[in-house]
């Protein structure tokens, strides 16, 4: 069992990583006998895990209700979140309830925002079931829903009280979803840890094969890196923005193509290449390092170009609505070397457009 802590003073919380955690009542602390909980999951995951998690909580004396939402990024909306509020109010659940987010990034983000909003804030536990949510979205307290004009535009910073990562969930994960999660894994190596990037180059096949030892180390290292960043910059005023490498381009792809048509990790993968090409054009990143990123993304089964039907010009309106825009100026996370990155403002739009064109046209 791997265990680490996100250090935020009185709001610190544990991340527990192991196979079989869903069968251990202690995994879901601080829930205890007499507590009330609302399990939030989706229609795909409910047949796989809902009864197991409900049963282990009820064995501990927790009073459990549940709500099952439709599955897909297109349902990460205020309208669907209202379903959670209705379920909470119908029982009713008070301020002492705990929401349990049993699912991937959509369920985690939506449930977290519901927890931040319901009766001005209740506890919630993250139980991520996808690799992407296990290494990224479940840690750090960023919660949100989408708006037709932009991804994650309506939300709050609201930390969970615990993160429970059961490695067995990955055994039921579609290969495309596994690859999507590996995009966020690779991102950590590019922005923060060159040694980890090299480890990924040597172990990507083991991760694709769901080797328990390799996967446990991979998830722990990603969570360690994110926990360090969140502890230093919880509200994303500086350092934490580096975690958005590829996301400004990627969110543009998701919004333009319609949420759910490109998985988040797929869009981020293409966005990372575009960010690397931008940094190349600015003379601060080596072409051979861009190629290392491309090669690793391809081995993980990820796209290294954006949608062919999306013009370079189509990216800009979405990118100018990005949350990192400051005083009307686009700011991009750009790699400086494998394991080092910066948040840079004032990148000329023609450089960005050229980098997108480079990505789309290059022989990769």
Swiss-Prot record:
One GO biological process this protein is involved in is: amino acid biosynthetic process
Q: Does the keyword Glycoprotein apply?
A: no
Q: Which residues bind NAD(+)?
A: 71-76, 105-109, 129-130, 142, 151, 169-172
Question: Which key words tag this protein in UniProt?
Answer: Amino-acid biosynthesis, Aromatic amino acid biosynthesis, Cobalt, Cytoplasm, Lyase, Metal-binding, NAD, Nucleotide-binding, Zinc
Its top-level enzyme class, in one word, is lyase
Binding positions (Zn(2+)): 184, 247, 264
Task: Give the Pfam families listed for this entry.
Answer: DHQ_synthase, DHQS_C
Domain of life assignment? Bacteria
What is the name of this protein?
Answer: 3-dehydroquinate synthase
